[in-house]
């Protein structure tokens, strides 16, 4: 029996300190760990990062998403973790990725930085759907460009 799918969208502040190489090394560790653990937990998703913030979409069974998110909340590389949405979903939008990534040099990340600046990191002004749509649009574009 298939468990119902859920989608969680959150943002957090980046607490990784150091030069660009140090920060990118930490991001690589996050991605490597996620790409190993997420398929085992039946989680797919996407991470977006710029120097100041993370945004992430996680898709999968409710309890698995919740367990993964609890680990994220305890990770010292994140602070001010805010859930923008956590809802049932009919299908996965990031099924091809255990953890897709849009880095600080991407167009999406620049737009994300603008959204975060515009909102003043105020969760009341941010919408999970806006972050989700931004990630989806740019990952699908990147995927089609790589074909």
For the regions a protein language model found, what residue spans apply to each?
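Charge-rich, low-complexity N-terminal segments
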Residues: 1-147
